Amino acid sequence: MQKTINEAKRIGAFYDFNTFAQNSLTNNLRWFFILDFESTCFEDDIKKPAEIIEFPVVILDSVTGTLIDSFQSFVKPTENPELSVFCSNLTGIQQCDVENAPTLAVVLRKFEHWLRKAKENLGCSFKGQPTSTAIFVTWTDWDISTCLWDECRRKKLPLPGDMLNRIDLKAIFQQWLGSHKIGQKWRGGLKDALNLIGLHFEGRPHRGIDDARNTSRLLLHLLSKNVLNFATS
């Protein structure tokens, strides 16, 4: 972990939160765009490519501690259009939710339009330290670096460039636990992380929009506890 942090510092992809007083950040970062995709999945680890079936993003204003906007869309899978029973039971997403939903190509265009408007309204930028005022947040880096990246590659779709500026909150949470001698080998999920800090998961686990909202609650708690090291991927 320290080697990774040192390398992140060397290339300038490192965010250092030294203070978080009176709900005010001391550097430029203010807006956190938190996403959590849900994808097709199959029982018994059947090797089929994952396709996004829910695409949610919420915006956290870290100064006020509130969610100020959101984007959410179901997505129609095209490679394996029939949801497995396992997938529906896990996520609560039914075949009827995705049957008439737009494809990923259409959802990405809608998302880019929403993101452009959000950046204009908030006056925020993802350009990178030290000018960045916004960053994407995920619970594990799977959502962007594996799920979205692989599907965009297979379907020859452009990956939203702003998503390259992001942080993996699970890695940061593990680092924080390590600093409190709980250990960096902790392997719990989002619900477990919330329980560890005395919060309860609100909504349904494995529903993307609920996962994103709960990730924002965990992030806000970490900010309030002066968690220092935020490294981008």
Feature map (PLM): residue ranges:
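Metal-dependent phosphoesterase signature
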Residues: 90-118
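Flexible, glycine- and charge-enriched loops at secondary-structure boundaries
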Residues: 46, 101-104, 205
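N-terminal accessory regions of nucleic-acid-interacting proteins
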Residues: 1-37, 42-44
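Metal-dependent phosphoesterase core characteristic of DEDDh/y 3'-5' exonuclease domains
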Residues: 23-25, 30, 48-53, 59-91, ...
